[in-house]
Amino acid sequence: MKKFLFTALLAVAGFAAQSQSNSVLVYGSLGINSAKTAADVKTNSFSFTPGAGYQFNDHWTGGVNLKTESWKSGSPQIKSSAFSAGPFVRYAYPLSNIFAVFGQLNTNWATGKVAGVKSSGFEGVLFPAIGVNMKNGFALNFNFGSLGITTSKVKGQSGSSTQFGLNFGSGAGFGISKNFGL
């Protein structure tokens, strides 16, 4: 598993947010949240989502993405975690030297644990985004919404669950990327 993750991380390191043929792009986002309700219930969460890929031509990029998340909530404390990894494909359309729009499809194998109960499954997510090219191959990426499906099965139980989601205007994300020319 460690070899797979290392190989995937290296592969993702080759993709760029901007449209630049024969280049490698490395991107990611980080999330840290903490909340406390009036009933003194505390929730803490952490997420890290890196990816890397190769820019085949001025529009198409393919690579590998990873996602790790963890949560702690309540009293007594309930711990949850999730991990997913898989390939992605991105189609980018430059609007100018500064702005580009792109759509990205992530297809991941996923595993998780909530209060000691393990599950595994598959997730597919398609999302639109805007890239703002900065200097030296860096870009700020803003995604806004998603279309996704997730299937999961709890270990030791028969049957599985499926979730479908369409979110536009109700969710947004921010990330950074670096493009390395080859």
Question: What is each model feature region?
Answer:
Residues 31-39, 67-76, 94-96, 108-116, ...:
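Sequence/structural signature of outer-membrane beta-barrel proteins
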Residues 18-65, 69-71, 113, 167-182:
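Short glycine/proline- and aromatic-enriched beta-strand/turn motifs that initiate or cap beta-hairpins
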